[in-house]
Amino acid sequence: MKEPWPDAHQRQLAVASVQESLPELDWTLHPAKVKRFSQDFHWFSPILKAQLKEKQADAVVRPRTESELRKLVSACVAHGLPLMMRGAATGNYGQLVPLQGGIMVDMSGFNHICQQREGILRAQAGIRLGEIEKSARATGWELRCMPSTYRQATLGGLFS
């Protein structure tokens, strides 16, 4: 039976190929930084801390536009690379931790309110909930769902 994901060596080659084809993207390859971006607060749990200790992405990429994001996703699919989306990593259950390596997509560059009118707000996935709350309150509205980490948590992370 074929493994669903490439092994570590195949992933390294695939990541290098994707990086070479998309040099305009903001890449992070330094091992300590990649490790940090591959973690949430799962280490609060001694069980998850042990289970996820060695798990991390092979690279982190921060796209700045939808076009860059589309190109990145297409390249990862073409190479069979796992792809994980990262908001602010405020969760504590290990949902963001890459189990099979791959590319971590830092969505922090997607942090704008696109449209706001009475009772409706459309925003990008990387915007912090605190910013949405501030903008909503200025117009007499408020968020209906307020996690304890709302000042740091992102819209995309809340709904993923």
Where are the predicted features?
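FAD-binding core of FAD-dependent oxidoreductases
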Residues: 34, 79-160
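N-terminal flexible segment immediately upstream of the FAD-binding catalytic core
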Residues: 1-74, 90-119, 148
